[in-house]
From Swiss-Prot:
The encoding gene: groEL1
GO cellular component, one term: cytoplasm
Subunit structure: Forms a cylinder of 14 subunits composed of two heptameric rings stacked back-to-back. Interacts with the co-chaperonin GroES.
PANTHER family: 60 KDA HEAT SHOCK PROTEIN, MITOCHONDRIAL
Taxonomy, superkingdom: Bacteria
InterPro entries cross-referenced by the UniProt entry: Chaperonin_Cpn60_CS, Cpn60/GroEL, Cpn60/GroEL/TCP-1, GroEL-like_apical_dom_sf, GROEL-like_equatorial_sf, TCP-1-like_intermed_sf
Subcellular location: Cytoplasm
Assigned EC number: 5.6.1.7
Name listed for the protein in its UniProt record: Chaperonin GroEL 1
UniProt KW Ligase keyword: no
Organism whose genome encodes this protein: Thermosynechococcus vestitus (strain NIES-2133 / IAM M-273 / BP-1)
Keywords: ATP-binding, Chaperone, Cytoplasm, Isomerase, Nucleotide-binding
Residues that coordinate or bind ATP: T29, L30, G31, P32, D86, G87, T88, T89, T90, G413, D479, A480, A481, D495
Keyword Chloroplast (UniProt): no
Length: 545
């Protein structure tokens, strides 16, 4: 495939053009009075969104070079989304402002490498300052404020997420599901819950609700497939003598063994229920070990030299109550805190050591099931389009609250960045010289871009509002929803420090890369063939096949 090569100013200008298009599409959503963007979908109804990274992912331009610019700035948004889960629009607006300002200086003859060094040093200074100004999140009121702002000023959502965080703790997991009703509901599960139900509906003890509820049961955990009932007979006899119910968690139970269990259950000889083991492969083994730790039992596995036919009562776990439906199993156990704590600590260390975000997420889920609990928010809405929009907003809100708990909160609405601009200016004048100083000044001028855009989206003059905010104390900023200057902490307009920091770092990184670009190589567009009219081969020429 032939390539097109563009050098110097032309290359940078083409990138800038693509960035302008993307930044404008994303920036319209910024702030409490930001608008929505409608995305056409190949199948199904159009999607209405207010989420920066979702919009950025949709934009593809015809011109390959401009499209490269789009891809670069999109990276700033998605990297921020990966790191903090929110702040994607801010990252896009910041990156765009830095590139605009920087290109002006490069065109005037400044050295891009020196500018990049200045940008990097300024960013490092600002990151330290953001950490200094961050306040730790102590109460659920602050969590509710962060969540409400992130969900588009929805206080009800804020309260719901704060409530969920309260119930499941910092280690807990809050997941989203599409609800069946118009209202958004919160459901918190006590104990460990996994997505496997009973193997046979005959195990249900409550036929009306089709669930099996076993109080004070023994728990047999094994990673092997149970094929012969003879393997189970010794342990079943011991459990029957003890007069307690039994829950079997195994890879699978073949028909013959299953039939025997069902017959015993129906005749009332033994109250028993069987569940397939959750997960796959190594993850299944780890989850079975988690269940064994929680219930103070052992995993009966040949890896440890244990066989089912030799199993003793003291190898079985005990639970306070186990509830099994056709889709999931919930184990509520108590009294084994020490072992559970040690297991949680082990999982935490694994989380710190792993680089894969997927593994991190799965380990976090395991930790939540052991330590805190799991909250499910069922998102309700009148139409599917609204449901998707709400789900995206809620996702942002959950991520923002987690980020706030990690690194604390700072004044929101672009205020922190505007107040840090004079501090950066003074520091740069003292510590930097020449073109590095110009690089720091590029960052300093870009810091006001998010607030300026928030004000413009609210129909105000952005430049005037930025100047007025600069004159006020650090915690005071502009509330675009009410059009007044307020203490941002008192008004509940706060951002997680992690979100502000990630947006700034990723914007500076992309800006530095664009400014130091001297040449672009892209595919040459293929010439379009002009088919003579009506030359559709055999079938009607109007259709795409």
């Amino acid at each position: 495939m032939a390539k097109r090569i563009i050098y110097n100013e032309n290359a940078r200008r083409a990138l800038e053009k693509g960035m302008d298009i993307l930044a404008e599409s994303v920036a319209v959503t910024l702030g409490p009075k930001g608008r929505n963007v409608v995305l056409e979908k190949k199948f199904g109804a159009p999607q209405i969104v207010n989420d920066g990274v979702t919009i950025a992912k949709e934009i593809e331009l015809e011109d390959h070079i401009e499209n490269t610019g789009v891809a670069l700035i999109r990276q700033a948004a998605s990297k921020t989304n990966d790191a903090a889960g929110d702040g994607t629009t801010t990252a896009t607006v910041l990156a765009h402002a830095m590139v605009k300002e920087g290109l002006r200086n490069v065109a005037a003859g400044a050295n891009p490498i020196a500018l990049k060094r200045g940008i990097d040093k300024a960013t490092q200074f600002l990151v330290e300052k953001i950490a200094e100004h961050a306040r730790p999140v102590e109460d659920s009121k602050a969590i509710a404020q962060v969540a409400a702002i992130s969900a588009g000023n929805d206080e009800e959502v804020g309260r719901m997420i704060a409530d969920a965080m309260d119930k499941v703790g910092k280690e807990g997991v809050i997941s989203l599901e599409e609800g069946k009703s118009m209202t958004t509901e919160l459901e918190v599960t006590e104990g460990m819950r996994f997505d496997k139900g009973y193997i046979s509906p005959y195990f249900a003890t409550d036929t009306e609700r089709m669930e099996a509820v076993l109080d004070e049961p023994f728990v047999l955990v094994t990673d092997k497939k149970i094929t012969l009932v003879q393997d189970l007979v010794p342990i079943l006899e011991q459990v029957a003598r003890a007069g307690k119910p039994l829950v079997i968690i195994a890879e699978d139970i073949e028909k013959e063994a299953l039939a025997t269990l069902v017959v015993n259950r129906l005749r009332g000889v033994l109250n028993v229920a069987a569940v397939k083991a959750p997960g796959f492969g190594d993850r299944r083994k780890a989850m079975l070990e988690d269940i064994a730790v929680l219930t103070a039992g052992q995993v009966i596995t040949e890896d440890a030299g244990l066989k089912l036919e030799n199993a003793k009562l003291d190898m079985l776990g005990k639970a306070r109550r186990i509830t099994i439906t056709k889709d999931h199993t919930t184990i509520v156990a108590e009294g084994n805190e020490k072992a559970v704590k040690a297991r949680c600590e082990q999982i935490r260390r694994q989380i710190e050591e792993t680089d894969s975000s997927y593994d991190k997420e799965k380990l976090q889920e395991r930790l939540a099931k052991l330590a805190g609990g799991v909250a499910v928010i069922k998102v309700g809405a009148a139409t599917e389009t609204e449901m998707k929009d709400r789900k995206l907003r809620l996702e942002d809100a959950i991520n923002a609250t987690k980020a706030a708990v990690e690194e604390g909160i700072v004044p929101g609405g672009g205020t922190t960045l505007v107040h840090l601009a004079p501090e950066l200016s003074n520091w740069a004048a003292e510590h930097l010289t020449g073109e590095e100083l110009i690089g720091a000044n590029i960052v300093e001028r870009a810091l006001s871009a998010p607030l300026r855009r928030i004000a413009e989206n609210a129909g105000q003059n952005g430049a005037i509002i930025v100047e007025r905010v600069k004159e006020k104390p650090f915690d005071v900023g502009y509330d675009a929803a009410k059009d007044e200057y307020v203490n941002m902490f008192d008004a509940g307009i706060v951002d997680p420090a992690k979100v502000t920091r990630s947006a700034l770092q990723n914007a500076a990184s992309i800006a530095g890369m664009v400014l130091t670009t001297e040449c672009i190589i892209v595919d040459k567009p293929e010439p379009k063939e002009n088919n003579p009219a009506g030359s559709g081969a055999g079938m009607g020429g109007d259709f795409d096949y």
